[in-house]
Amino acid sequence: MKASGSLDSWREYFRRRGDSDIFGIIDHAIMVAATDCPNKFKSRRDKIAELLFSCRVNRCVGCDHLELSVPGDDEANRGTTGNGGGGTAVDEDYEVAGGSKESKANSSRGDNNQIVSNYTFDEAEALSDEIEEFSVVSKEVARIKEILLNKEDEPNSVLLDSLRHLKLMSLNVDILKSTEIGKAVNGLRKHSSDKIRQLAKTLIAEWKELVDQWVNTTKEITGAEGTPESANPSVLDEEEAFPSLPYDVDIFTPEPNGFEISHFFDSLDFDGNPRNSEEHNTSREHERRPQNIAKRKPEGTQMRIQDAPFRSIKPSSATDFDGTRRPVKQSTEQRMKNETVSVHKSEKPMIQRKPVVTEQKRKAPGPQQEKLKGLDADAKFEFAKRKLQESYQHHENAKKQRTIQVLEMIPKQGSAQKPQLKRPGMSNRNWANGRK
């Protein structure tokens, strides 16, 4: 503790100034020290700030006297002389304060002598009473536990009184955990006496509810406080992990490619073989012309017409009355052969007609070309438009003729005459009429 004589001397020193405020003196003293002794003030201001936050008034243990507790008081008092002069005590106090930078590393020296209790006398007395009560209750519960464990040797009245005593006692979770009284009471839940059995079940239910409430409260407190960073492994992993490289997102984006699939297919012929550059350019020019559309359309229609007989053919549903299915299969096979032969015959005129049309297109009269040369752009456009419509009409007529020929060649399914069955009743009736 700080010597009372040093504080009294300084108290008298400040009181001589009259009605001056002590806090005003402190403020002005700091200003004067910072102005007159700036270097020394810088070296000591850390200790001054530490002194401001470390000074506290504590109540002495054993009496109600208030004492000032300042770290490093004992060392300062050891260095003071026996004359009790206030000036020397204060100077040595400041010497200790100024030399505290070395003592920060050795601040743990003599901590047992410098520790001052932060509890007041009433708090310390209440704490001691609580500890004493805990020990007394624990001893009583341990005594009752021994009685309950020896339930075979004890009468029912003693067991019942022990359980009632436990019910009247206010037990907490610490006592239940330290004494393990729950195991002893749980063994009485199947006792022969109804009162003992019922009282044991009641105690177990109350203690279980108490423990559940304590667990829930603990979880809520820990959840509110939050887990420390050391308990969170992800934080440690992030700190110990290598720093991530500053990747640029644009590096991973694919470069734009100007190659189009349409150009790839244009460079191939119908068989999948690559064309020459000249053939590729000429094919591109022919595709742009409208005549190519007129040439391709009848080909698709011709293929559709050729496939029509095969799609329209259905197996005959005629059945043989003799019960055997073999003649039915033979008849369907013969019919399919006849239809294929007729289709092949119908294809011959179509194949012969195609070159005729192309030859007619290829043969263009010379005077007609000369007339086209003399016309302007609008007249040429109208002429090409009329020719295109005529070619469309020609192909439509050819398409109708082919469909009519194919439909005439397909045999009608309903034309086959079904054999007439003779009813046995009619023959018997005729036979009876003949006898008459």
Curated annotation (Swiss-Prot):
Coiled-coil intervals, chain numbering: 382-402
Ranges of compositional bias, category Polar residues: 427-436
Biased composition (Basic and acidic residues): 276-290, 332-350
Quaternary structure annotation from Swiss-Prot or TrEMBL: Component of the Mediator complex.
Subcellular location: Nucleus
UniProt main location, coarse: nucleus
Stretches assigned to the TFIIS N-terminal domain: 139-214
Family according to the record: Belongs to the Mediator complex subunit 26 family.
GO molecular function: translation elongation factor activity
Function per UniProt: Component of the Mediator complex, a coactivator involved in the regulated transcription of nearly all RNA polymerase II-dependent genes. Mediator functions as a bridge to convey information from gene-specific regulatory proteins to the basal RNA polymerase II transcription machinery. The Mediator complex, having a compact conformation in its free form, is recruited to promoters by direct interactions with regulatory proteins and serves for the assembly of a functional preinitiation complex with RNA polymerase II and the general transcription factors.
SMART domains, A to Z: TFS2N (SM00509)
Keywords on record: Coiled coil, Elongation factor, Nucleus, Protein biosynthesis, Transcription, Transcription regulation
Annotated region described as Disordered, given as residue ranges: 71-111, 263-376, 408-436
InterPro entries attached to this UniProt entry: TFIIS/CRSP70_N_sub, TFIIS/LEDGF_dom_sf, TFIIS_N
Entry-linked CDD domains: TFIIS_I
CC per GO annotation: nucleus
Name under which the protein is recorded: Probable mediator of RNA polymerase II transcription subunit 26b
